[in-house]
From Swiss-Prot:
Secreted is among the record's keywords: yes
Tissue specificity of this protein: Expressed by the venom gland.
GO molecular function, one term: toxin activity
Similarity comment: family membership: Belongs to the neurotoxin 10 (Hwtx-1) family. 67 (Jztx-67) subfamily.
Principal subcellular localization: secreted
Segment forming the signal sequence: 1-19
Superkingdom assignment: Eukaryota
Name this protein carries in UniProt: U37-theraphotoxin-Cg1b
Subcellular compartments: Secreted
Single GO cellular component term: extracellular region
Length: 50
């Protein structure tokens, strides 16, 4: 019975760590995308765009 409880606790801990890691990665991606959106110069209406 204790072994089953330990396994369930470890599974719950791994799920919590995984979700917090995904949230952290998503927030980092949002910060980076916001930073690069600000840094890009606005496109000008050019005839020949490469």
């Amino acid at each position: 019975m204790r072994v089953l409880l330990i396994i369930a606790g470890l599974a719950l801990l791994s799920v919590v760590c995984y979700t917090s890691e995904m949230k952290e990665q998503n927030s980092l991606n949002e910060v980076l995308s916001a930073f690069f959106d600000v840094e890009e110069p606005p496109e000008k209406g050019c005839i020949i765009c490469f």
